[in-house]
């Protein structure tokens, strides 16, 4: 750490505190993520190892935050990242109204380029959300926080935890307890982020897992084996049933969005994971080639993080009161009225 001068605190993650720092010799500004080990015998946390491994696999992408160095420090170690001025959550929070169509296209295009690069290298991020999409001083968007990332097994045989992704961006298969999944979880999250940029607020702001499903059902309709055959194989499929609910046309949900935007959004927000449009295909969608064209990064808003104390983290969904099959349903809900329309009568 002697080669760096700490300039201030940026924030705090699951496994460490992040500082803004300056390299003493070169003057380069970086972000230092200090990871402390609770006990030396426990070794490096799995999330930190995953982040290092994932970033080493995809270090050549200009749309993924660059890991510059890893070095030991005290009873832990430090990750040195390129410094990014802000994040997409700050952009959305400070916007006085929904972003201009050209700005939405630009952010989404950069996000898709990063996701396409990750997926081409068999990396599934598993926690895409605006707070993990960092913005540089020049307006460049880069994907960060690979603590939940995994190297994807193309044969589909590996089992993973379903407790990944921040709830508002969590794919339906994860909400139904899927242990086998693929890049589709990232593509659903991209759709949620796109909808949030178009809407100015999250599309599916559930306060627990059941409310999250209800938010999705309210727009996309009740999933059925006819539309999504694999749903019957998911662990939590029969733990709660919902009344039949017809989908709401996306043009009613986002009346100001263009037909091209709604068409692309609809190809992300599909129940069957393998029917979701791939990131590489989405980049070729007509949405990006019709007026207005994507804005240049220099034309994008970059909210400055104020000096002094680090800004509070983007308010995400609370991770409490989750549904559990052995717990009375009314105890699992913060707002029981939200799901009442979906519960069968009798």
Swiss-Prot record:
Source superkingdom: Eukaryota
GO molecular function, one term: cyclin-dependent protein serine/threonine kinase activity
GO BP of this protein: cell division; embryonic brain development; embryonic camera-type eye development; embryonic skeletal system development; floor plate formation; negative regulation of smoothened signaling pathway; neural tube closure; positive regulation of cardiac muscle cell proliferation
Chief localization: nucleus
CDD domains reported in the protein's UniProt record: STKc_CCRK (cd07832)
Active site, UniProt feature: 127
Keywords, ordered alphabetically: ATP-binding, Cell cycle, Cell division, Cell projection, Cilium, Cytoplasm, Developmental protein, Kinase, Nucleotide-binding, Nucleus, Serine/threonine-protein kinase, Transferase
Catalytic activity: L-seryl-[protein] + ATP = O-phospho-L-seryl-[protein] + ADP + H(+); L-threonyl-[protein] + ATP = O-phospho-L-threonyl-[protein] + ADP + H(+)
Residues noted as binding ATP in the record, renumbered to the chain: 10-18, 33
Positions with biased composition (Pro residues): 303-318
Domain Protein kinase: 4-288
InterPro entries documented for this protein: CDK (IPR050108), CDK20-like_STKc (IPR048002), Kinase-like_dom_sf (IPR011009), Prot_kinase_dom (IPR000719), Protein_kinase_ATP_BS (IPR017441), Ser/Thr_kinase_AS (IPR008271)
Leading EC class: transferase
Record's subcellular location: Nucleus; Cytoplasm; Cell projection, Cilium
Keyword GTP-binding: no
Gene3D superfamilies: Phosphorylase Kinase, domain 1, Transferase(Phosphotransferase) domain 1
Region (Disordered): 298-324
EC number of this enzyme: 2.7.11.22
One of the record's GO cellular component terms: cilium
Recorded family membership: Belongs to the protein kinase superfamily. CMGC Ser/Thr protein kinase family. CDC2/CDKX subfamily.
Record's subunit section: Monomer. Interacts with MAK. Interacts with TBC1D32.
Job of this protein: Involved in cell growth. Activates CDK2, a kinase involved in the control of the cell cycle, by phosphorylating residue 'Thr-160'. Required for high-level Shh responses in the developing neural tube. Together with TBC1D32, controls the structure of the primary cilium by coordinating assembly of the ciliary membrane and axoneme, allowing GLI2 to be properly activated in response to SHH signaling.
Protein name: Cyclin-dependent kinase 20
Gene: Cdk20
